[in-house]
């Protein structure tokens, strides 16, 4: 996924062409993927795992919010923060309010994304990631700052709406798809799942205009290719609470995936076997390659046992604690 430091490489490459300013327009384009405000509209607005989804996605569509105490008030920073560069996010604004339980509130104007935070939640200082809901504007704004850092003066960015005739001056390549998949599976990155899912739908000729239509196309493909007759998808990440999948469907999908792509298990995490007390079983020779899934009241594990057993097999374990869920809701 695109990060600020990778975007800085593009700004540096632009500078190396000898361009120092442009007199026309600075346009950005989503590559044909219309922006989606958030994956699941029923989730709280401030959750970073429920970001917007578009063709331009920067820093997992998150902005870093940092606050420090300054006497009786607070100083705020909103940055497209990365390891090397920390450009200010000019398209996002934060204010504080004296109010009760609701920690964050969000609103938009034509120019800005406006957040407010309850002062009682701030303490002495701290920082956290917040989602951005206009990822194209955010990405272009960060690039505008990075270009200025490398001596290229650009006008304020504008949404191109549709791609126009153009000539490529420079580019950067993404990581290989296999690396992107490994990162997605390791860190459970919903945005990556949605981006790859929509891209796959477009590549196969389906309707990718919304997450729901794209997910329906994926569902139809999964029924045909992965033997998942009971699967119901409303997005590509599984975040929406209307999504349904059985353990049987998951096992069928794992078996079919290995046939379609024999190297698929190596994308998964290697998990060491444990005994009935939860301790690592050092005597076991089993090789478990699997994906974990954990929420407040749900725990899941699905993958393969490929070595150390008489017959390799796929498995899926889904568990939930309904009493805990009831307490949370």
Regions found by a protein language model. Name each.
Residues 92-264:
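A small/polar active-site loop signature that marks catalytic segments
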Residues 19-20, 48-50, 108-110, 174-177, ...:
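Extracellular/periplasmic catalytic domains that process cell-envelope and extracellular macromolecules
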Residues 9, 21-23, 51-53, 60, ...:
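Extracytoplasmic
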Residues 1-57, 61, 200-249:
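Mid-domain, small-residue-enriched loop/turn segments at the edges of structured enzyme/sensor domains
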Residues 86-109, 140, 167-173, 280-309, ...:
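Short, Gly/Ser/Thr-enriched beta-strand-loop segments that form substrate-interacting elements
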Residues 19, 27-84, 242-284:
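A conserved catalytic-loop motif detector
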Residues 217, 228-329:
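C-terminal soluble interaction/assembly domains
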